[in-house]
Design a protein with these regions (language model features):
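Extended ligand-binding clefts on enzyme/binding-domain cores
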Residues: 46, 127-155, 171-247
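Aromatic- and histidine-enriched alpha-helix N-cap/loop-to-helix transition segments
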Residues: 52, 77-91, 150-160, 218-225
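Acidic, low-complexity Ser/Thr/Gly/Pro-rich repeat segments typical of extracellular/periplasmic
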Residues: 1-38
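Active-site-adjacent structural elements in enzyme catalytic domains
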Residues: 55, 78, 105-120, 143-145, ...
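Well-ordered alpha-helical scaffold segments within catalytic/enzyme domains
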Residues: 36-45, 88-102, 117, 157-172, ...
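Membrane helical hairpin/interfacial module
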Residues: 79-87, 91-148
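Sec/Tat-exported extracytoplasmic proteins
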Residues: 18, 63-67, 93, 122, ...
């Protein structure tokens, strides 16, 4: 099937590299097409969905940092792990446990490793975490100039995963009860109101212990920003006012 047709016209006045003129012009017809033959074995939609879920999960599981369990920024990022990506990874682990890719015990152990690392070895800034963290030490890895402290949106992406895990691991066992308690403690420690910057009716993306709110980036938009306002409004300890959510 032809998708597009093009006509290439070479004018006889065109000179060669030696300076001579072409004796005759040329017209070439170029057509683009699509090779619609199968390149891989066809599989049912449900099998395709399972394969996509498995491969997505494998990134977070196989390439998770060996010490902290958190998600690496990319496969070549060494010790640099990402908070928001870790939230995505936690949710992938819940799917993996539910689908039987791993056991429930394996999933709860990995999530507990992540939570313990965040709790015991990472620096929290008014309860929020940096975008990048050294997965071996817990030290903040600056994401950009003057961005060496809290990233509230990345923290939100992290906690949407952790809160999903808290809801999923609901069995009355010592292991799952401990995980729920640890997640709750970290969740309740986030001071969302601090990020209003002098009480403004908007949340700010960054805060640095060295530069304060100098990056001055307000969190706005129907995108990854929305989860921040949902979590900030639903906090049991440091909820933002209704006017901030509605603004």
């Amino acid at each position: 099937k032809v998708l597009s047709s093009y006509k290439l016209i070479v004018n006889p006045g065109v000179k060669s590299t030696s300076g001579t003129l072409l004796s005759n012009g040329k017209v070439c017809m170029i057509k683009t097409g699509m090779d619609d033959t199968d390149k891989f074995e066809r599989i049912p939609d449900e099998d395709l969905l399972t394969l996509v879920q498995k491969q997505t999960f494998k990134y977070f599981w196989d390439f998770g940092h060996e010490y902290s369990g958190m998600a690496r920024e990319r496969t070549t990022s060494g010790d640099v792990v990402t908070t928001g990506g870790t939230g995505f990874g936690v949710m992938a682990m819940l799917v993996a446990a539910e689908r039987g890719f791993i056991t429930r015990q394996q999933a709860v152990e990995r999530v507990q490793k992540i939570v313990t690392f965040l709790d015991k070895e990472c620096t929290a800034y008014h309860g929020a975490y940096a975008h990048w963290i050294n997965g071996a030490t817990g030290a903040t890895k600056p994401f950009s100039e003057k961005d060496n402290g809290a990233d509230l949106v990345e923290t939100s992406l992290l906690f949407q995963g952790l809160l999903a895990a808290r809801a999923y691991f609901k069995e009355n066992t010592e292991v799952e009860s401990r995980l729920r308690a640890d997640i709750t403690r970290l969740w309740e420690a986030i001071d969302w109101t601090w990020f209003r910057k002098n009480g403004e009716d908007v949340l700010y993306w960054h805060w640095s212990p060295d530069y304060g709110f100098e990056k001055n980036l307000a969190i706005r938009g129907w995108n990854e920003c929305l989860i921040t306002y949902i979590l900030a409004a639903s906090s049991p300890t440091h909820a933002i006012d209704k006017v901030v959510y509605e603004a």
